[in-house]
Amino acid sequence: VINNAWLTEMVSHALRPEIGAVGARLWYKNDTLQHGGVILGINGVANHIHRGIAKGEPGYFGRAILIQNFSAVTAACLVMRRDCFTSVGGFNEEQLAVAFNDVDLCLKLIKSGLRIVWTPYAEMYHYESASRGYDNTLEKIRRSQQEIVYMQEKWSKWLTSDPFYNPNLTLETEDFSLAWPPRLKRLPIN
């Protein structure tokens, strides 16, 4: 825990009736950012943005230091009301045993009319994959590939058009660089 008011900060957002889930700013032990929100479509399904930036850096247009809406946040530190969790069926543990169950949960919340908030004022250190391990065996790689296919089939429209990410930016990396070729086609002038 970095900020002792982390829970108060997260609960203050989660209690708002229009909010489905709240995520925190998570740091690696070397004080670089691990989680600053999730962007859909990056690397095929979703990825954390601002990964690796140093403490004190504002990120792309200040997004690493501003409370904002996202399509998803990590469940590594997630606060939500029980009624929100149960109303969308909770985590899909059958098809998403390890990866993307948090993204799936957040998308179900958005589909039900709720919003997802990320706050930089709830800060903690996160030891990524310490409990679940890495996808470094054939069995884990197969499971990971099945989870990717499931997400791409279920949420294909969302993964190509995240409303909280500029469509002029690439889905190949999480560095906010321009997409080339452009993801948006030229609009007719009529």
Which stretches of residues belong to each language-model region?
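Short acidic (Asp/Glu) and glycine-rich catalytic loops that position anionic groups and cofactors
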Residues: 125-131
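Non-transmembrane alpha-helical segments in soluble domains
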Residues: 11, 37, 106-107, 148-152
